[in-house]
């Protein structure tokens, strides 16, 4: 009997915008759907967390002082619901069964997040898209990804980004930046690296949850990672 594999994939909201920098690019939705479909074909259970930065960021919205940080974060949570519904549509159009679960109750649009219900959906081969962050301000969608992964007992979190992994410093600014294939949780919290925010990394460390950072636009990358090939990615785990 094949061992159950369950993963949580975190997509940034900005990635959905493509070159436009804002909104949702249909071609990217189609690409994401094709990549997730390959995972389902290979009997991999998939949860997804999506950011909202292509629409609004709570921190940025609050910078001018007119909007409070809590309200800005609430706006950001709603942005993730918009993105989650878009991903749901794309996945369903490719023939997959999908459920969106929101941390904030909004019955007209999606289910309310219930851990055991999410687990049952995954066991039945459905993709579950987790929306509205943790439902609380001051927590990032990266922290949401780790939290949901721990709750659903995922084997790993894959942070699918626009770069191929983690460097010891910004490769856009420094030509001598070194690619890090593996690093510890403590190294991942260093200011010059910042794989995720400290809350997310600390939660992953406490639960020994591996985090793989990869290029989401590399076709077949997600499946390769889950099958054990992380040569083109960065993995955060215990030494």
UniProtKB/Swiss-Prot annotation:
<keyword id="KW-0021">Allosteric enzyme</keyword>
<dbReference type="GO" id="GO:0005829">
    <property type="term" value="C:cytosol"/>
</dbReference>
<feature type="binding site">
    <location>
        <position position="161"/>
    </location>
    <ligand>
        <name>ATP</name>
    </ligand>
</feature>
<keyword id="KW-0418">Kinase</keyword>
<dbReference type="InterPro" id="IPR015963">
    <property type="entry name" value="Uridylate_kinase_bac"/>
</dbReference>
<feature type="binding site">
    <location>
        <position position="52"/>
    </location>
    <ligand>
        <name>UMP</name>
    </ligand>
</feature>
<feature type="binding site">
    <location>
        <position position="167"/>
    </location>
    <ligand>
        <name>ATP</name>
    </ligand>
</feature>
<keyword id="KW-0665">Pyrimidine biosynthesis</keyword>
<comment type="similarity">
    <text>Belongs to the UMP kinase family.</text>
</comment>
<dbReference type="InterPro" id="IPR001048">
    <property type="entry name" value="Asp/Glu/Uridylate_kinase"/>
</dbReference>
<dbReference type="InterPro" id="IPR036393">
    <property type="entry name" value="AceGlu_kinase-like_sf"/>
</dbReference>
<comment type="subunit">
    <text>Homohexamer.</text>
</comment>
<feature type="binding site">
    <location>
        <position position="53"/>
    </location>
    <ligand>
        <name>ATP</name>
    </ligand>
</feature>
<keyword id="KW-0963">Cytoplasm</keyword>
<protein>
    <recommendedName>
        <fullName>Uridylate kinase</fullName>
        <ecNumber>2.7.4.22</ecNumber>
    </recommendedName>
</protein>
<dbReference type="GO" id="GO:0044210">
    <property type="term" value="P:'de novo' CTP biosynthetic process"/>
</dbReference>
<feature type="binding site">
    <location>
        <begin position="134"/>
        <end position="141"/>
    </location>
    <ligand>
        <name>UMP</name>
    </ligand>
</feature>
<comment type="pathway">
    <text>Pyrimidine metabolism; CTP biosynthesis via de novo pathway; UDP from UMP (UMPK route): step 1/1.</text>
</comment>
<dbReference type="GO" id="GO:0033862">
    <property type="term" value="F:UMP kinase activity"/>
</dbReference>
<dbReference type="Pfam" id="PF00696">
    <property type="entry name" value="AA_kinase"/>
</dbReference>
<feature type="binding site">
    <location>
        <begin position="10"/>
        <end position="13"/>
    </location>
    <ligand>
        <name>ATP</name>
    </ligand>
</feature>
<feature type="binding site">
    <location>
        <position position="73"/>
    </location>
    <ligand>
        <name>UMP</name>
    </ligand>
</feature>
<keyword id="KW-0067">ATP-binding</keyword>
<feature type="binding site">
    <location>
        <position position="57"/>
    </location>
    <ligand>
        <name>ATP</name>
    </ligand>
</feature>
<feature type="region of interest" description="Involved in allosteric activation by GTP">
    <location>
        <begin position="18"/>
        <end position="23"/>
    </location>
</feature>
<dbReference type="InterPro" id="IPR011817">
    <property type="entry name" value="Uridylate_kinase"/>
</dbReference>
<dbReference type="GO" id="GO:0005524">
    <property type="term" value="F:ATP binding"/>
</dbReference>
<keyword id="KW-0808">Transferase</keyword>
<feature type="binding site">
    <location>
        <position position="170"/>
    </location>
    <ligand>
        <name>ATP</name>
    </ligand>
</feature>
<comment type="function">
    <text>Catalyzes the reversible phosphorylation of UMP to UDP.</text>
</comment>
<dbReference type="GO" id="GO:0006225">
    <property type="term" value="P:UDP biosynthetic process"/>
</dbReference>
<keyword id="KW-0547">Nucleotide-binding</keyword>
């Amino acid at each position: 009997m094949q061992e159950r594999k369950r993963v949580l994939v975190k997509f940034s909201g900005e990635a959905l915008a493509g070159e436009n920098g804002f909104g949702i690019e249909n071609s990217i939705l189609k690409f994401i759907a094709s990549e997730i479909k390959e995972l389902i074909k290979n009997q991999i259970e998939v949860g997804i967390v999506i950011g909202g930065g292509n629409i609004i960021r709570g921190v940025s919205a609050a910078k001018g002082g007119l909007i409070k940080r809590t309200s800005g974060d609430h706006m950001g949570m709603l942005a993730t619901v918009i993105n989650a519904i878009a991903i749901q549509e794309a996945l369903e159009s490719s023939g997959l069964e999908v459920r969106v679960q929101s941390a904030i109750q909004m019955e007209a649009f999606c289910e309310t997040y219930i851990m055991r219900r999410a687990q049952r959906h995954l066991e039945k081969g459905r993709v579950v898209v987790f929306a509205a962050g943790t439902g609380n301000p001051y927590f990032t969608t990266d922290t949401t990804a780790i939290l949901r992964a721990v709750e659903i007992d995922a084997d790993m979190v894959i942070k699918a980004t626009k770069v191929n992994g983690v460097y010891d410093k910004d490769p856009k600014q420094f030509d001598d930046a070194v690619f890090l294939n593996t690093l510890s949780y403590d190294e991942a919290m260093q200011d010059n690296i910042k794989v995720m925010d400290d809350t997310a990394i600390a939660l992953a460390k406490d639960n020994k949850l591996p985090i793989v950072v990869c290029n989401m636009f590399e076709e077949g990358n997600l499946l390769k990672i889950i099958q054990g090939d992380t040569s083109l990615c960065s993995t955060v785990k215990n030494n």
